[in-house]
Amino acid sequence: MHHVVSATTNPAKIQAILQAFNEIFGEGSCHIESVSVESGVPEQPFGSEETRAGARNRVANARLVQPSADFWVAIEAGIDDGSTFSWVVIESADRRGEARSATLPLPEVILEQVRAGEALGPVMSQYTGIDQIGRKEGAIGVFTGGKLTRSSVYHQAVVLALSPFHNAIYR
């Protein structure tokens, strides 16, 4: 059984990680341990590079907390060019996989508050009245009318980032 450390305690992110690992390696093939670690970037990262750096930093910090795992996974959400997205970084002892998620364009009324220094999650909670929306369906669920959720979009990116770990062409 694979020991997977998720560098997050966010249920939406953990669900995406668990689902992707089960699909790639088989149902029940992994045990996920969640740890809370720092990203080393602002609470609301801006731009692709800052967001990816946050995910890479979380993986590095998770490795320090739990060095005996088989995989370390981080999902860092950010804002880039008026849209929300995330970077997924997965590492094993000898390999790294990274993938950027799909992007969701955000309404200007939301972006104004985020640009003023507020994080997207709290802004969306104020807008919707849903407490801790970032730990649930997120802005993605709200603006797609539930057709997609934060977790479903993250899931796709985790599957993509896992490609180097199970596809022989990468070796």
From Swiss-Prot:
Tagged with keyword Acetylation: no
HAMAP family linked: Non_canon_purine_NTPase_YjjX
EC number: 3.6.1.73
Assembly and binders: Homodimer.
InterPro entries: ITPase-like_fam, Non_canon_purine_NTPase, NTPase/PRRC1, YjjX_NTPase
GO molecular function, one term: nucleotide binding
GO biological process, one term: nucleotide metabolic process
Gene3D superfamilies, alphabetized: 3.90.950.10
Binding positions (Mg(2+)): E38
Cysteine pairs bridged by disulfides in the record: none
Cofactor names: Mg(2+); Mn(2+)
Chain residues that bind substrate: T8, T9, N10, P11, A12, K13
Superkingdom of origin organism: Bacteria
Family: Belongs to the YjjX NTPase family.
Its job: Phosphatase that hydrolyzes non-canonical purine nucleotides such as XTP and ITP to their respective diphosphate derivatives. Probably excludes non-canonical purines from DNA/RNA precursor pool, thus preventing their incorporation into DNA/RNA and avoiding chromosomal lesions.
Alphabetized Pfam families for the sequence: NTPase_I-T
Enzyme class: hydrolase
Sorted UniProt keywords: Hydrolase, Magnesium, Manganese, Metal-binding, Nucleotide metabolism, Nucleotide-binding
Catalysed transformations (reactions): XTP + H2O = XDP + phosphate + H(+); ITP + H2O = IDP + phosphate + H(+)
Protein name as annotated: Inosine/xanthosine triphosphatase
Residues annotated as signal peptide: none
Cofactor note: Binds 1 divalent metal cation per subunit; can use either Mg(2+) or Mn(2+).
